[in-house]
Amino acid sequence: MNILSRIFARTPSLRTRVVVATAIGAAIPVLIVGTVVWVGITNDRKERLDRRLDEAAGFAIPFVPRGLDEIPRSPNDQDALITVRRGNVIKSNSDITLPKLQDDYADTYVRGVRYRVRTVEIPGPEPTSVAVGATYDATVAETNNLHRRVLLICTFAIGAAAVFAWLLAAFAVRPFKQLAEQTRSIDAGDEAPRVEVHGASEAIEIAEAMRGMLQRIWNEQNRTKEALASARDFAAVSSHELRTPLTAMRTNLEVLSTLDLPDDQRKEVLNDVIRTQSRIEATLSALERLAQGELSTSDDHVPVDITDLLDRAAHDAARIYPDLDVSLVPSPTCIIVGLPAGLRLAVDNAIANAVKHGGATLVQLSAVSSRAGVEIAIDDNGSGVPEGERQVVFERFSRGSTASHSGSGLGLALVAQQAQLHGGTASLENSPLGGARLVLRLPGPS
């Protein structure tokens, strides 16, 4: 019972459905044609029997006026029964007398045998009628034989259609089987899995949809891996970079809690704790921005007006650093597709580095647009960066020899990250103002 329930509960395969649909589709016209042929055969056999009776009657009628002593049989139909009635006299060519029936053709039973009877009225002084009959046995046997042939032909036609459908369905479902095999062979760790199917357009559409789905899954998997790597990196770097300042803070706090220091020394220790706390806060904030940058996607990119972005950055820098002279070189509007917050972060960090580590008092912002893209430059009159250190300072927690030790060492790393996220580069050069020039080269839309 369980096996049967499983069989009937199981969803039929596509191949089976194609075969069933083809068999039903073939059965309908075959049954219609078979029914027409069946009825046609039945009527034709009956018409043949009627023609036999007509022929036998036509042969017998000329002999009736000669007398009823002998009624000859038709030479073409020796089995035909002939019964002649003239008045009250009834004469038959056999021991079976056909009953009197209405004119034309009629069916009757004599001694339990079914007969087809043709009755013809002959005009004359005395009413005379000739009844010619024949059994249905031969006609029924012949009709049944032809009916069996029709059934066999119809059954063969439907069966042949089902067999051909089964064979052709094998080719039709082959792309789907290939798709299933390729899907089963895909492991969770596969990179950019490929699903290639050729054949039916429906299978190709499903394969394309699966490729898109797998690509999205793969992209999300990569993002998850990147997020996990970023989290591990964040934890490792945070542990390494924060251990020293936290140890210094703990030492200072222990000194404050255990020693009775003079006011000036106590104030100096407290200031050191505050500076260390600010450094830790800056480091954590920079690490957070780095992690956010690594998790950004192309969906976050929007049109950005670089000229307007630099103008706002210059105004904000003038407010944050009152002693700094910040200017923007006039230029036409430059619009690219990018991350507004990320580009603003890169420009702000470049200005902050120029002030904090280069001691700059003059910063000049500019943007130049070309077919290749946009080039953003931040020039300052600070101490600059030695040529041998211009690549190293873009690494995380890397500080130049001229940099102060109060920063997190992540400012230029954030700039390099944003350049990479936009498909561009970040580099340091000599500035016409005497200090350093930080250049962001961002490609235009492809």
From Swiss-Prot:
Natural source organism: Mycobacterium tuberculosis (strain ATCC 25618 / H37Rv)
Annotated membrane topology: Multi-pass membrane protein
In this chain the Histidine kinase domain maps to: 237-446
An example GO BP is: phosphorelay signal transduction system
Alphabetical UniProt keywords = ATP-binding, Cell membrane, Kinase, Membrane, Nucleotide-binding, Phosphoprotein, Transferase, Transmembrane, Transmembrane helix, Two-component regulatory system
Q: Report the catalytic activity.
A: ATP + protein L-histidine = ADP + protein N-phospho-L-histidine
Q: Does the entry feature the keyword Cell membrane, yes or no?
A: yes
Question: What does the UniProt PTM comment say about this protein?
Answer: Autophosphorylated.
Localization annotation: Cell membrane
Record PTM Phosphohistidine, positions in chain = 240
Any one Pfam family here would be: HAMP
Location, primary (coarse class): membrane
Record's function text: Member of the two-component regulatory system PrrB/PrrA that is involved specifically in early intracellular multiplication of Mycobacterium and is essential for its viability. Functions as a sensor protein kinase which is autophosphorylated at a histidine residue and transfers its phosphate group to the conserved aspartic acid residue in the regulatory domain of PrrA. In turn, PrrA binds to the upstream promoter regions of target genes including itself to positively regulate their expression.
**GO MF annotations, alphabetized:** ATP binding; identical protein binding; phosphorelay sensor kinase activity
Fetch the CDD domains from UniProt.
HAMP, HATPase, HisKA
Report the coiled-coil segments: none
Gene Ontology annotations for the cellular component aspect, listed alphabetically? peptidoglycan-based cell wall; plasma membrane
Which EC numbers characterise this protein's activity in its record?
2.7.13.3
Membrane spanning residue stretches: 19-39, 151-171
Please tell me which top-level EC class this enzyme sits in: transferase
Sorted alphabetically, which PROSITE patterns does this protein's record hold? HAMP (PS50885), HIS_KIN (PS50109)
Does the UniProt entry include the keyword Transmembrane?
yes
Q: Which superkingdom, per the lineage? A: Bacteria
Domain HAMP: start-end pairs: 172-222
Induction info: By nitrogen-limiting conditions.
* Annotated SMART domains: HAMP (SM00304), HATPase_c (SM00387), HisKA (SM00388)
Q: What is this protein called?
A: Sensor-type histidine kinase PrrB
